[in-house]
Amino acid sequence: KVSVGTQASKAFKKIKGAVVSVEAYSNSSSGSDTLEDLFGDSGSSETSTSEGSGVIYKKDGNTAFVVTNNHVISGANKVEVLLSSGKKVKASVVGHDSVSDLAVLKIDASNVKQVATFGNSDNINVGETALAGSPLGSEYATSLTQGIISAKKRTIDVTDSNGTSTGQATVIQTDAAINPGNSGGPLINLAGQVIGINSMKLSSTGSSTSSSSTSVEGMGFAIPSNEVVSIINQLVQNGKVVRPALGISLVDLDYVSEADRSQTLNLPSKVTSGVVVMKVNSSSPLKKTDISKYDVIVSLGGKKVSGLSSLRTALYGHKVGDTVEIQYYHKGELKKANVKLTLESNDKNTSTASNSGN
């Protein structure tokens, strides 16, 4: 009988050469008043601002493609990839997506000796062995951590680099050590297949300034490989992810006072969650309904809408052109409308938690 350790070692060898470190640089200014400033050198320089991992998943002619996290390369004006051989190469961004926190880079394929393969994340089971690596980026590159699949479909709230809510994500939970530097790297099974892309870890519960905050260990999260494949294919083909939109501006009902809920929205007291329509754009598909300012959306496509995060999750579960049923309160009355979803008018896919365009 082959031990788990032996299987893990074989799996590591299958993917070792495809795992890379990703380093992002941005311009910084020294702010000093020097002779160089007087002669045209402002003192700006490229500084490494972020480091994570990535995995080479495809070679096409002279080009190799790397998947990593969007937050690793976001805002960078230069990206470099450190191969398992120790060679550092320039990378360019093919496309990135803040909602899924995924990005695709391309590099010269001449130095690429190994490419990873994706497994089917729908087929994983709780308790199965999971492997991750590069816990602190390039300093500990090509190292390996081992754990299990703790949960297949864990729903968590997601924010971008500015702390803005971008919705909710269904992720794989694992106790394989996930640390700074793991971001963007692969979570693999014992067959050496990528079953997820490591994205984040939960280090504490509650507010960091709260006395009730509790330190947490062994809770890492990875984006399921089936979702990864869908997203990166779109990024390579279009440079972005195409998502549907409603063409409206919204605010969480949580931000509305009890008095305004009753007097302005005419909302029944039993309705305690939802999103308030603040504006319907001229090109919005909702123009064909009577949904208007101060209406409260409580359901989309059969899924409860408790706030902006859950609305985005429900909305992004559909495609452009889909017709969905929206349930909403209009002047205190619960109504329904069928709406055909249109193309999102911007590529940012992010907005403030208190006021959002969707």
Regions found by a protein language model. Give the residues of each.
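Gly/Ser-enriched beta-turn/beta-hairpin loop segments
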Residues: S30-T49, G95-D101, E139, K153-I172, ...
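N-terminal activation segment of mature serine protease catalytic domains
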Residues: K1-L35, E51-S53, N125, N233, ...
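Terminal peptide-recognition signature
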Residues: V20-V22, L38, G54, A64-T68, ...
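C-terminal recognition in membrane/secretory proteostasis and scaffolding
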Residues: K10, L190-A191, S204, S230-N358
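Conserved active-site neighborhood of the chymotrypsin/trypsin-like protease fold
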Residues: K58-T142, S299, K303-S309, A314, ...
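Gly/Ser-rich catalytic serine loop of serine hydrolases
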Residues: S50-S53, V115-N120, V171-I188, V277-K288, ...
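Active-site loop architecture of trypsin-fold serine endopeptidases
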Residues: G31-S32, S48, A76-V79, K113, ...
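A conserved glycine-rich beta-strand in the N-terminal activation segment of trypsin-fold
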Residues: V2-K10, D41-F65, K87-K90, Q114-T117, ...
